[in-house]
């Protein structure tokens, strides 16, 4: 399998990384099966988070006896050093390990630094000295925080959304991490489900200028895993046909659109923002029947109860006018019900 070296960490990871957020939705037995199948077929990098409910526990069950042969990254959303220690100890316990390869701050609104009020970086540094974590990383959806993390020189890896829908500012982040010797871990390679052609997504990431990029693909079903494993044997190339797919997607998905990251949640009015705010796209890019069910009609109707409190706008890492986006999607949705 093609490998990627994560910058100054020196860690050599499979170009296909296993994103373990979706396995929280399946049984422990099914998750262990998928994880072990991935490992025995050449995938050695698994990414999870303390916030992903039982994902860490399932990783621990799958790799208790092969821990030294895999690379694990996990995340803490803690706001203080004290809480970071609690998260770290719990992650170590649930994954049945005494160290984490890459320990990441999970989408913080600021860039943790030594001596700041949060105490997060100081705690991570101490954990590294104790051997409980080997490398300190950060994940983010915000351009400004990502840039600050790169410029600080404090972080060994950056996990950031990246796909062929990336804007110029996103591409600049990718280039800057390479110059800084940081490992770049690409999340949202399928843009939260809006990209349907995984071959095009994979081929785009496989270009020479992205040789330092390690994409992680969220896997929940065996056929999804098989799809990415097949690219190891027969890597898709960025030919005219795949470029046409990319060009069409870029035309349809340019501008302001919801990536479905969910950082706006929860909504005080009970609106499922991360799906409702991109309903127009989902209706046109996926089978419509599921989105037009009575259940989804009720969920979309909740948009009428929007409080216009502005909480979602403040939380949105992409600076979207979320209430306006919800209203537009709702009006469009109603046209499909006539």
Question: What are the language-model segments listed below?
Answer:
Residues 44-49, 73-74, 134-137, 157-160, ...:
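Short catalytic-loop micro-motif centered on adjacent basic/acidic residues
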Residues 19, 49, 103-106, 139, ...:
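Conserved residues at the C-terminal ends of beta-strands
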Residues 69-72, 155-163, 235-242:
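Short hydrophobic/aromatic-enriched beta-strand-loop microsegments
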Residues 29, 79-185, 190-193:
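Glycine/proline-rich, positively charged
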Residues 3, 35, 56, 60, ...:
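Generic structural signal for well-ordered alpha-helices
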Residues 39, 43-44, 172-186, 190-338:
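Structured C-terminal cap/extension of enzyme domains
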Residues 6, 18, 46, 59, ...:
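Conserved, mostly hydrophobic/aromatic
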Residues 1-70:
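N-terminal binding-site loop/beta-alpha segment at the start of enzyme catalytic domains
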């Amino acid at each position: 399998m093609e490998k990627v070296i994560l910058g100054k960490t020196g860690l050599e990871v499979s170009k296909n990384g296993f994103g373990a957020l979706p396995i929280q939705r399946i049984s422990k037995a099914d998750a262990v099966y998928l994880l072990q199948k991935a490992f025995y077929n050449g995938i050695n990098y698994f990414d999870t988070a303390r916030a992903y409910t039982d994902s860490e526990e399932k990783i621990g069950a799958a790799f208790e006896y092969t821990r030294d042969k895999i690379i694990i990254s996990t995340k803490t959303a803690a706001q203080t050093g004290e809480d970071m220690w609690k998260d770290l100890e719990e992650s170590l316990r649930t994954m049945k390990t005494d160290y984490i390869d890459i320990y990441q701050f999970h989408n913080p609104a600021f860039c943790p630094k030594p001596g700041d009020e949060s105490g997060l970086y100081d705690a991570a540094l101490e954990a590294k000295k104790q051997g409980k974590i080997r490398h300190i990383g950060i994940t983010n959806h915000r351009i400004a925080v990502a840039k600050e993390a790169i410029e600080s020189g404090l972080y060994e890896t950056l996990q950031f959304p990246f796909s062929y829908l990336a804007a110029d500012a996103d591409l600049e982040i990718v280039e800057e991490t390479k110059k800084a010797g940081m490992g770049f871990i690409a999340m949202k390679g399928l843009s939260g489900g809006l990209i349907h052609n995984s071959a095009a997504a994979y081929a785009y990431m496989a270009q020479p200028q992205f040789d330092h990029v390690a994409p992680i693909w969220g896997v929940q079903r065996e056929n999804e895993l098989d799809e990415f494993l097949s690219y190891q044997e027969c890597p898709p190339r960025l030919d005219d046909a795949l470029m046409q797919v990319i060009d069409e997607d870029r035309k349809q998905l340019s501008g302001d659109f919801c990536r479905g990251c969910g950082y706006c949640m929860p909504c005080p009015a009970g609106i499922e923002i991360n799906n409702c705010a991109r309903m127009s796209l989902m209706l046109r890019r996926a089978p419509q029947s599921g989105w037009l069910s009575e259940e989804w009609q009720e969920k979309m109707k909740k948009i009428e109860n929007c409080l216009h409190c502005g909480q979602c706008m403040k939380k949105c890492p992409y600076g979207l006018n979320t209430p306006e986006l919800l209203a537009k999607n709702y009006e469009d949705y109603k046209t499909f019900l006539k």
